[in-house]
Amino acid sequence: MALARDAKLESDTLQVLQDVANRLRIHSIRATCACSSGHPTSCCSVAEIMAVLFFHTMRYKQADPEHPDNDRFVLSKGHAAPILYAVWVEVGRICESDLLNLRKIHCDLEGHPTPRLSFVDVATGSLGQGLGAACGMAYTGKYFDKASYRVFCLMGDGESSEGSVWEALAFASHYNLDNLVAIFDVNRLGQSGTAPLEHCTAVYEKRCQAFGWNTYVVDGHDVEALCQAFWKAAQVKNKPTALIAKTFKGRGIPNVEDAENWHGKPMPKDRADGIVKLIENRIQTNRNLTPKPPIEDSPRISMSNTKMTSLPVYKLGDMIATREAYGLALAKLGQSNQRVIVLDGDTKNSTFSEVFKKEHPERFIECFIAEQNMVSVALGCATRGRTIAFVSTFAAFLTRAFDQIRMGAISQTNINFVGSHCGVSVGEDGPSQMALEDLAMFRSIPNCTVFYPSDAVSTEHAVYLAANTKGMCFIRTTRPKTAVIYTAEENFVIGQAKVIRQSAVDKVTVIGAGVTLHEALVAAEELSQQGIFIRVIDLFTIKPLDAVTIIQSAKATGGQIITVEDHYREGGIGEAVCAAISREPDIVVRQLAVTEVPRSGKPSELLDMFGISARHIIAAVKDTVMK
């Protein structure tokens, strides 16, 4: 494709871009030298790419990096963070002297970028995830904001071995994300040796083309070729573009360029000054280029009206699965705010997110069976507060995306996860479908609220609370139908449990959630007929846990607690309760949980086989009382 007249570049512009690239190299070398760690060679391979992107191609407001109309940039190869910080020194947002505090505890210029910095949308550094997040940003720009901003993602060639990269490539082409450009920094070298394809740019190109992408192979150190390729990419419709840049690690550094064993090593201090002087001698001007301003056409949005529009419609005793109640609540939530979106991994007819899709099809994203990418896409969609994202699949399959979820926490995201088909109550499908580790996983995530509703009414409240809660949330839903135990007027608060059965003569406090709460209620009724009374607590949120209610109830019942959960013992409800009462010497906790890998069977059979049915609760209560 020939360049249009306005895309032609003057020689002085090209020289300024090359000079900027070399200044970026110098900043990266000095910063990593100052902290005696970091990745200057990985920075040097992308210096021209970064110079062209930020000072020629991208449109953004220098003084407002978070502006909704700015082009987006994701540094998927997060170890090259120093050169990103160097860019913002050249832009004027960071003092050059601050670079010398790179990686120091009092400085936000960390070893890998995080959103502590206003110009970073998502944390990176765990490789292979940046493109998925960029897909979410691009999808939001094209389909929700319907805006002009574009998204650029810079990746390393080593990380292209990650399967999540190819999940993202498939997603982007399926949804025709022509506002997305992925840049492969093909510098040949990985951390401990060569990358698998080394400099075979033709293979990268064929693979990207096979995934439905428009492609350009360029010399990644030729600023004019880069400018032309980015301009061409902007003209392409209905396809994302992959720019495959042949580069050299450590470019511009004598005896280091394209040499192995320099990954993650700063330049020796006795050589650094000489290297910097050499690069400075290549710089012909101190001029800079002013980025083009963005096209301001993103809609102005508000999240303040994300409220429960009406009370739940369920009646006491109605039988409905919490997974179905989730779908119905989500559809209702979607009516209150047009920025509520839902992502699912080809399980919408099981998680019941299909109810939302039927009412709001334009806000439903089918991510197919690619859970890692689904989480990254949601992360991208939620950046800059553009959407309220719910992500649903079987809870067992969310474990596959634990690293993406972990990085979401580092990114300070507000994604809401919903995992269905939890525990042995899944039944005949067997252990591969049963989430028995999910509570442990989400409890370990910083600032993550963990909901475990026990009926349809509490599920609806959990959905609305999650939508309005800062940080990540996880809602655990179950497959079998359970009875509605709360009236429509019942109020729910994060961190407050419900004492749903009590008397003045209770002997034991039994704590459950989900299906085991209903087993506890059955046990309580049968025990009462035998003259034994127990207190039953519905936790509602596992994190934060209502320690006050638990301790008060335990002290009122002789210091005796029994926890019962459809989850492995490790990391579940029992351990959470034990932690909550750890400073109470007179309280004893007995845990009923799944203790081995289960098998197929009817839900009731499995609850009984693995010791968490009403029968086992009754036996545990009697044993406790007898002691």
From Swiss-Prot:
Disulfide bonds: none
Record family assignment: Belongs to the transketolase family.
Sites marked Important for catalytic activity: 39, 263
Origin species: Mus musculus
Binding-site residues for substrate, renumbered to this chain: 39, 263, 323, 350, 421, 429, 479
Catalytic activity field: D-sedoheptulose 7-phosphate + D-glyceraldehyde 3-phosphate = aldehydo-D-ribose 5-phosphate + D-xylulose 5-phosphate
NCBIfam families assigned to the protein according to its UniProt record, in alphabetical order: PRK05899.2-5
Keywords: Calcium, Magnesium, Metal-binding, Thiamine pyrophosphate, Transferase
Cofactor note (record): Binds 1 Mg(2+) ion per subunit. Can also utilize other divalent metal cations, such as Ca(2+), Mn(2+) and Co(2+). Binds 1 thiamine pyrophosphate per subunit.
Cofactor: Mg(2+); Ca(2+); Mn(2+); Co(2+)
Protein name, per record: Transketolase-like protein 2
Spans through the membrane: none
One Pfam short name: Transketolase_N
CDD domains cross-referenced by the UniProt entry: TPP_PYR_DXS_TK_like, TPP_TK
Assembly information from the UniProt record: Homodimer.
GO molecular function, one term: transketolase activity
GO cellular component, one term: cytoplasm
EC number, as in UniProt: 2.2.1.1
